[in-house]
């Protein structure tokens, strides 16, 4: 019996896939649990329509994320910190500091999306990668200056 999956099932496939299963498995488990629909002509057409609508939404969101990434690429953050000897900072500039500086500029970014291997502990210019979306990354310039 052919069914359309409405949930991701590791043993069968992804949402929206049409798979062939035993009729008893479909009637006794998949249909009552709401994990699948029977693959009738009407359901297949509805699935195709949903896929097209979802693809259009994804493309729109992708374009918006590309626009945000472009704006972030143009940002240069200037952070002032107290300095000890030889241009070393008393503390450090962490992902949280970069996140709050970006928020002041109007960009809402999760701290985990800021790709900073180690905190910045010296004066200078640095580039930091910021993940805007799963496949889209931007780079932000970070300048650490001496606070007077």
Curated annotation (Swiss-Prot):
Keywords: Ribonucleoprotein, Ribosomal protein, RNA-binding, rRNA-binding. Pfam families: Ribosomal_L9_C (PF03948), Ribosomal_L9_N (PF01281). It comes from Syntrophobacter fumaroxidans (strain DSM 10017 / MPOB). It comes from the Bacteria. Binds to the 23S rRNA. InterPro entries: Ribosomal_bL9 (IPR000244), Ribosomal_bL9/RNase_H1_N (IPR009027), Ribosomal_bL9_bac/chp (IPR020594), Ribosomal_bL9_C (IPR020069), Ribosomal_bL9_C_sf (IPR036791), Ribosomal_bL9_N (IPR020070), Ribosomal_bL9_N_sf (IPR036935). One of its GO terms (molecular function) is structural constituent of ribosome. The keyword Mitochondrion does not apply. Belongs to the bacterial ribosomal protein bL9 family. The keyword DNA damage does not apply. The lineage of its organism: Bacteria, Pseudomonadati, Thermodesulfobacteriota, Syntrophobacteria, Syntrophobacterales. GO terms for cellular component: ribonucleoprotein complex; ribosome. This is Large ribosomal subunit protein bL9. The gene is rplI. GO terms for biological process: translation.
């Amino acid at each position: 019996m052919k069914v359309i999956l409405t949930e991701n099932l590791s043993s069968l496939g992804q949402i929206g896939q049409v798979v062939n299963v035993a009729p008893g498995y479909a009637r006794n488990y998949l249909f009552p649990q709401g994990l699948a629909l029977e693959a009738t002509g009407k359901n297949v057409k509805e699935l195709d329509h949903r896929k097209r609508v979802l693809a259009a939404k994804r493309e729109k969101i992708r374009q918006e994320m590309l626009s945000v990434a472009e704006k972030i690429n143009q940002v240069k953050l200037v952070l002032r910190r107290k300095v000890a000897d030889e241009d070393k900072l008393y503390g450090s500039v962490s992902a949280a500091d970069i996140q709050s500086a970006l928020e002041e500029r109007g960009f809402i970014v999760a701290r985990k999306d800021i790709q900073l291997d180690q905190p910045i502990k010296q004066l200078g210019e640095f580039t930091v990668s910021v993940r805007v979306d799963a496949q889209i990354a931007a780079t932000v310039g970070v300048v650490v200056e001496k606070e007077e």
